[in-house]
């Protein structure tokens, strides 16, 4: 038995050691390796095939890509992108320098961006202007998504805007400033000796009103309050701030930054003097804001020396943003290394985000009403029906005025001031069936979404009634109905939607209730041409013949 086993082992050893066996073993290993590598490559190929890239727009030039589209002087960029989406689909890509841009013009795809992929799209791209004028790393609007941004957003929303106490305070401050603006409008009307009405640049009047509202709620400036102690100095600083802010908007609208397309070429913007000009404007705005902060600190010191309660330094509804932020500094600390600098940034963002957009929207509203007198008539009848004869419309009446609300919705649908919303991806993701690599810039064409014929019947027509008697009755402006997102959506949605709408509703209701208005143009029509720009602004001034409305008879 033992010898039999030994013979078998010797036989196996001879077979194993033979050259033919070695060749067979090598062949088998090679075959297995080839099959394994083929399987790996097949899996990778299949996976890559599943990563479908969005359609690429043709016509890109070497080096600059589709930059020529941004430079067109005969049509608005958002309209150009809208035409391209008709050709390439609601999701496509173009190239700006070496940067890939994903253009989205469909509400369902936008919903996917700001729900499923909201974290991926939670950052805004940095530009030369945000870097040197808006201090993007410390900004609530432009700072990277993370702990700092969340803390700043929480302070803005909970301490400055949304809490019941602050909401009531803001309402009172805005109402007082709107009242002041209508006093000035009445003064203009009183200069009319012909009885035919006074010609007023209403776009300028609306812009002044919105600036004064923001000035009132941020640093407590009262327009027309010239008799108050220190009012002269404060008024001069306010005028300086307004002038510098206007200059900033001009730079943003007219000065092209090469480094926004090619970041490595910032030296060209320095040689052109653009960086210097932006720094000067940013420093000037911060310097003036510093004066307002010091004024508030001085008042607090005076309150302490008079043994007054620090919390009552600005009585109840008179507390402005600086008051609240200084109180937060007393109790804890603002995020960041320089609390004063943070306050300056928040002041600037309040003006940058609140003055131009609201005044531009109301300018569009009034233009549409003048071109649609039947809508204006119906809005006035609604106010007369819900507001007692002889009484002035109040903020508390606004919830009853559904047609006024529909007018504002329809205007913001047709003419969203922020016609394009921009983000960029921090990680690879998918939109629809398309793969989006990390670092891709996202451009949401809000203007195109608002005019989608598959969503909106007669999308180019001004029809406020669509929000009162169709499937759009429940559609609002708060960023949850993605077919109507003039304030944006997702984590970066505008935090001041409620306050902004309240301001526009009340100002518009006062204007409709109190004044007869018609276009000052010879044909009686308002020119609705839009500026050639990234945003949606009216091209020509809005001149209106306006006169106080006769009291209605019972």
UniProtKB/Swiss-Prot annotation:
Pathway field: Alkaloid biosynthesis
Tissue and organ expression note: Highly expressed in capsules. Expressed is stems.
EC number: 1.14.14.163
Name recorded for this polypeptide: (S)-1-hydroxy-N-methylcanadine 13-hydroxylase CYP82X2
Cell location: Membrane
Domain of life of the organism encoding this protein: Eukaryota
Record flagged with keyword Transmembrane helix: yes
Stored Pfam families: p450 (PF00067)
């Amino acid at each position: 038995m033992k010898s039999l086993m030994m013979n078998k082992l010797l036989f196996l050893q001879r077979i194993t050691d033979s050259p033919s066996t070695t060749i067979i073993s090598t062949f088998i290993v090679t075959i297995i390796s080839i099959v394994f590598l083929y399987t790996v490559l097949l899996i990778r190929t299949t996976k890559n095939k599943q990563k479908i890239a969005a359609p690429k727009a043709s016509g890109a030039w070497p080096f600059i890509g589709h930059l020529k589209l941004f430079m067109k002087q005969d049509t608005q960029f958002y309209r150009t992108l809208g035409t391209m989406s008709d050709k390439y689909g609601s999701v496509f890509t173009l190239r700006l320098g070496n940067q890939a841009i994903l253009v989205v013009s469909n509400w369902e795809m936008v919903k996917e961006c700001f729900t499923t992929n909201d974290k991926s799209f939670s950052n805004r791209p940095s530009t030369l202007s945000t870097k040197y004028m808006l201090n993007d790393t410390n900004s609530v609007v432009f700072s990277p998504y993370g702990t700092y941004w969340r803390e700043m957003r929480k302070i803005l929303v909970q301490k400055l805007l949304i809490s019941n106490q602050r909401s009531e305070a803001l309402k009172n401050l805005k109402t007082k400033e709107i009242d002041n603006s209508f006093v000035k409008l009445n003064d203009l009307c009183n200069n009319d000796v012909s009885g035919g009405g006074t010609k007023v640049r209403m776009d300028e009047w609306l812009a002044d009103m919105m600036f004064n509202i923001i000035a009132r709620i941020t640093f407590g400036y009262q327009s027309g309050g010239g008799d108050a102690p220190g009012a002269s100095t404060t008024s001069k600083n306010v005028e300086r701030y307004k002038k510098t802010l206007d200059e900033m908007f001009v730079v943003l609208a007219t000065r092209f930054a090469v480094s926004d397309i090619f970041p490595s070429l910032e030296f060209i913007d320095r040689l052109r003097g653009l960086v210097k000009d932006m720094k000067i404007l940013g420093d000037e705005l911060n310097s003036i804001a510093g004066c307002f902060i010091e004024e508030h600190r001085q008042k607090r010191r005076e309150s302490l020396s008079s043994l007054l309660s620090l919390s009552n330094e600005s009585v109840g509804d008179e507390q402005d943003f600086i008051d609240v932020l200084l109180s937060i500094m007393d109790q804890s600390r603002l995020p960041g290394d320089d609390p004063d600098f943070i306050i300056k940034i928040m002041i600037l963002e309040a003006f940058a985000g609140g003055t131009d957009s609201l005044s531009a929207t109301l300018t569009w509203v009034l233009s549409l009403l003048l071109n649609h007198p039947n809508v204006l008539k119906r809005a006035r009848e609604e106010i007369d029906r819900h507001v007692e004869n002889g009484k002035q419309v109040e903020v508390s009446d606004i919830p009853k005025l559904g047609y006024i609300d529909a007018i504002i919705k329809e205007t913001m649908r047709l003419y969203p001031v922020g016609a394009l919303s921009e983000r960029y991806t921090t990680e690879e993701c998918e939109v629809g069936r398309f793969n989006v690599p990390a670092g891709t810039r996202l451009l949401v064409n809000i203007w195109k979404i608002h005019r989608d014929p598959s969503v909106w019947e007669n999308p180019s027509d001004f029809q406020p009634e669509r929000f009162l008697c169709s499937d759009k009755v429940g559609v609002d402006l708060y960023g949850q109905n993605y077919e109507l997102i003039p304030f944006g959506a997702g984590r970066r949605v505008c935090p001041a939607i409620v306050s902004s709408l309240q301001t526009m509703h009340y100002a518009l209701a006062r204007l409709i209730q109190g004044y007869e208005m018609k276009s000052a143009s010879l044909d009686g029509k308002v020119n609705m041409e839009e500026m050639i720009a990234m945003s949606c602004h009216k091209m020509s001034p809005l001149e209106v013949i306006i006169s106080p409305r006769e009291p209605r008879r019972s």
